[in-house]
A protein has these predicted regions:
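Long, compositionally biased, intrinsically disordered segments
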Residues: 103, 107, 187-189, 222, ...
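Outer-membrane pore/translocation modules
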Residues: 38-46, 111-250, 264-265, 269-271, ...
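Transmembrane beta-strand segments of outer-membrane beta-barrel domains in Gram-negative
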Residues: 79-90, 94, 256-310, 314-328
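Residues that cap or initiate secondary-structure elements
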Residues: 91-93, 124, 161, 175, ...
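Internal hydrophobic scaffold segments of catalytic domains
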Residues: 29-31, 98-99, 107-113
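Short glycine/proline- and aromatic-enriched beta-strand/turn motifs that initiate or cap beta-hairpins
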Residues: 38-72, 76-106
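Cleavable N-terminal export/targeting peptides
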Residues: 1-62, 72-73, 333-338
Length: 338
């Protein structure tokens, strides 16, 4: 009885959140008074100085380190350094709400040597777990532990990925005790099929960590613009990790729709599975994701209701809802894209 009451309470919370989402989406194309923020004036006054101070610190720190190891060009060259702070709330039918406070940073030092960069980053792709765990997070990447900080060198590829494979080599250490050395090889390629609207992008990585062993992952992304506001994509992912010794795969079809300059919608249908000779579909789901730039291009809201059909409950439908707020500290960033 108590479990049933708890599930009913959780469902009510999810419905309230979903109602709020539908309300936001319904008014997403209505111009706001300030046109670049949905926050009240008092919140803007609190966030503005804090964001400016943190952004200056991130940018200044990366350029100071880069100038020490590199050249005076560090004061003017573009840098991919950033800090992201996020708060995520996830709910699945039959389970309690799961809260996750995440911090991810990346210090990109572009002038250390020609085509050689010193990279300091938290939570690389190799530490993000299974494809199912990656799917459960709305972020393209997530970082939760200071133990997974990498310090390494990356040799940039010289190729034009539209004409040939662009290859990058990297090596370094994971900052933890005992120190965990790593090496990785990445390749990328972009094709325009028959000079038409379809583009195929391939992104591959082969890695070795002393503690976790070898891993390999590949991503193939076939997409095209449908019109000025819609983009269609078919994405295939596969990964293998020595520590679990199984092949995981995911196939996604998604339609991205730009509502306006600050809002996008994504409609997705996906299947996730594992195994090679005896492959099994572990889950399939339908998801609607709404992403909104709620404040001046550096604070974003994501709301994503989904309907899952997991194998472990005989494909019975299970609702899920994820809410996420994230703030970026970086000079230039555009995270509301198709």
């Amino acid at each position: 009885m108590q479990r049933k009451q708890r599930e009913t309470t959780e469902m009510k919370k999810a419905l309230i959140a979903l109602t709020a989402f539908l309300s936001i989406a319904a008014h997403a194309d209505t111009p706001a008074p300030s046109d670049d923020s949905d926050l009240p004036e008092w919140a803007e006054k609190q966030i503005g100085p804090f964001h400016a101070t943190m952004t200056d610190w991130v940018d200044g720190t990366s350029r100071s380190i880069d100038g020490f190891f590199g050249t005076t060009d560090a004061l003017t060259v573009d840098s991919d350094s950033y800090l992201r702070i996020s708060q995520e709330l996830a709910w699945k039918e039959g389970e309690e709400f799961d809260q996750d406070l995440g911090v991810r940073f990346r210090l990109d030092l572009p002038t250390t040597e020609e085509r050689l960069r010193l990279i300091i980053e938290s939570e690389p792709d190799e530490t993000r777990g299974t494809l199912d765990e990656q799917e459960s997070s709305l972020a393209d990447d997530r970082g939760n532990s200071i133990e997974d900080v990498l310090v390494g060198l990356r040799h940039l590829g010289e190729g034009d990925r539209t004409r040939e494979w662009d290859t990058e080599l990297g090596a370094g250490i994971k900052v933890r005790l005992p120190l965990d050395p790593y090496a990785r090889l990445s390749t990328q390629r972009l094709w325009t099929l028959n000079d038409g609207p379809w583009k195929l992008h391939s992104d591959n990585r082969f890695s070795w960590f002393n503690e976790d062993g070898f891993s390999a992952r590949t991503r193939w992304d076939l997409g095209r613009l449908v019109d000025e506001k819609r983009h269609l994509r078919f994405i295939s992912n596969a990964q293998w990790r020595e520590e679990v010794d199984t092949l995981e795969f995911r196939q996604v079809a998604e339609l991205n729709q730009r509502v306006n300059s600050r809002s996008v919608l994504r409609y997705s249908a996906a299947v996730l599975g594992e195994g090679l000779s005896h492959a099994t579909i572990e889950d399939s789901y339908l998801q609607l994701r709404f992403r909104r730039d709620i404040h001046k291009g550096f604070t974003f809201l994501d709301v994503a209701p989904a309907l899952h059909f997991p194998r472990d409950v005989d494909r019975e439908p299970r609702w899920a809802l994820t809410l996420r707020v994230e703030m970026y500290f970086r000079r230039f960033i555009d995270r509301v894209t198709l």
